[in-house]
């Protein structure tokens, strides 16, 4: 089975391809010659994921899945949430986003946070959603060099390393995206039977 993954983020694409190996052939947006800036105008993770998956299905005709991920910090009323990628005002500026969040968390005792990913799948005319959550906390400083986004400041519960310190192999087994993708692959495995 071939599915388009509606992302331009090479890190996400690589992570998802590793997890779905053997379940589906994942095709990128560039593979279908899509260079569109797909709108993410919904106010929920589910809404944004569905917007992207529907866009590809309607415009290009491919079965597709898309994701949206948010970092939800308890003491900040679950911000940055759906606005995680543009929290500091500039789209996809991870350093600025982390710096803003660390500044807002300065002197906060409650550092509980969670990463949440929602995957929306449009397949054979039907829509499905799958979610994955990792609970953890925000560190007081950036730690580690691997990963992307907020990985250097997010430490999952029961671990002493941030996502950026633990390396991709470990992260790909426990991450929010991995959990959502595992639900997707389980669904596809049953669907293909």
Swiss-Prot record:
Its cofactor is Mg(2+). Belongs to the HAM1 NTPase family. The active site is at residue 68. It is an enzyme of class 3 (hydrolase). One of its GO terms (cellular component) is cytosol. Substrate binds at residues 7-12, 69, 148-151, 171, 176-177. The keyword Magnesium applies. Keywords: Hydrolase, Magnesium, Metal-binding, Nucleotide metabolism, Nucleotide-binding. It catalyses: XTP + H2O = XMP + diphosphate + H(+); dITP + H2O = dIMP + diphosphate + H(+); ITP + H2O = IMP + diphosphate + H(+). This is dITP/XTP pyrophosphatase. It comes from the Bacteria. Transmembrane segments: none annotated. Pyrophosphatase that catalyzes the hydrolysis of nucleoside triphosphates to their monophosphate derivatives, with a high preference for the non-canonical purine nucleotides XTP (xanthosine triphosphate), dITP (deoxyinosine triphosphate) and ITP. Seems to function as a house-cleaning enzyme that removes non-canonical purine nucleotides from the nucleotide pool, thus preventing their incorporation into DNA/RNA and avoiding chromosomal lesions. Homodimer. InterPro entries: dITP/XTP_pyrophosphatase, ITPase-like_fam, RdgB/HAM1. NCBIfam families: PRK14823.1 (NF011398), RdgB/HAM1 family non-canonical purine NTP pyrophosphatase (TIGR00042). Pfam families: Ham1p_like. Mg(2+) binds at residue 68. Binds 1 Mg(2+) ion per subunit. GO terms for biological process: nucleotide metabolic process; purine nucleoside triphosphate catabolic process. Signal peptide: none annotated. GO terms for molecular function: dITP diphosphatase activity; ITP diphosphatase activity; metal ion binding; nucleotide binding; ribonucleoside triphosphate phosphatase activity; XTP diphosphatase activity. Its EC number is 3.6.1.66.
């Amino acid at each position: 089975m071939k599915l388009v993954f509606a992302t331009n983020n090479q890190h996400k694409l690589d992570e998802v391809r590793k997890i779905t190996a053997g379940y589906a052939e994942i095709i990128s947006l560039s593979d279908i010659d899509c260079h569109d800036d797909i709108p993410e105008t919904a106010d929920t993770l589910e809404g944004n994921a569905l917007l992207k998956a529907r866009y590809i299905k309607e415009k290009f005709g491919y079965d597709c899945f898309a994701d949206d991920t948010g970092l939800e910090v308890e003491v900040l009323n679950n911000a940055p949430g759906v606005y995680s990628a543009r929290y500091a005002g500039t789209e996809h500026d991870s350093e600025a986003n982390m710096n803003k969040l660390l500044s807002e968390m300065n002197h906060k005792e409650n550092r509980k946070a969670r990463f949440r990913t929602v995957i929306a799948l449009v397949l054979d005319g039907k829509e499905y959603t799958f979610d994955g959550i990792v609970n953890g906390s925000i560190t007081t400083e950036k730690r580690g060099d691997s990963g992307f986004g907020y990985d250097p400041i997010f430490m999952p519960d029961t671990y002493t390393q941030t996502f950026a310190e633990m390396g991709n192999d470990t992260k790909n087994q426990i991450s929010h995206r991995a959990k959502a993708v595992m639900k997707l692959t389980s669904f596809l495995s049953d669907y293909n039977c």
